[in-house]
């Protein structure tokens, strides 16, 4: 609508008319803020958008290209929701099977197997190894579940008591030390940095001006300290790619992208292209995980059911063979 010549207020007003009742209240509050002279990024607080989406809109507001910013943030939000739906859809059936399998294990281990064990003892039948293992596991399961829940509660408490209160730089440092989360953290920070800086540079700002805006924004607090530190380093004569190369929280390819962009004069274009590439790579990996996770879960469930079946039936076959 902005590309068709509508003013921002008119576009939001038009969308509010056709929005669901729950969204209309938020959009009307947003309209009141716009009418009162608040900037867009402040008025958007009523919509409770994700921080990365708000950051993109803030950048587009500062460089004067709101239409492109809304399109880019909309695409990002749409991809996020699509991946979320695919993940939920792929995990719904396996989770149901896991719950059913756990119930089956509970019934067999605590109601059926004890009676069979008493019967086989009275008949002086030696139980197979697999049945003994299942019985031993059933005796340890309550302790394992208790330990699991205690650890889960401790992790939640640790997050809210300590990690949640850490400054942004320390949070990133902790995440980089956790296996499995380190690479994901680098990808998220790199992608947001490229989208933010690339969008600002595309609007005609210099690198120093773009970093100054990063230092002022309130949506991604980590970039506030990053912007301030990088500005000091650039004032001391360093190049941007040298600043990035020393930082462990960016992908190792980013300094080369920045160095090449500075040489060719296409830094904004290269940063935006690199961010799009990283988003596509992340989406491709998620799809790959979704394809792989279902067979793995089904195989594990099948193996558990097979073990329970053998634990129940082998003593029966052994008893029949002894007759």
From Swiss-Prot:
It comes from the Bacteria. The keyword Lyase does not apply. The chain crosses the membrane at residues 93-113, 141-161, 188-208, 296-316. It is found in: Cell membrane. Required for transformation and DNA binding. Belongs to the GSP F family. This is ComG operon protein 2 homolog. The gene is comGB.
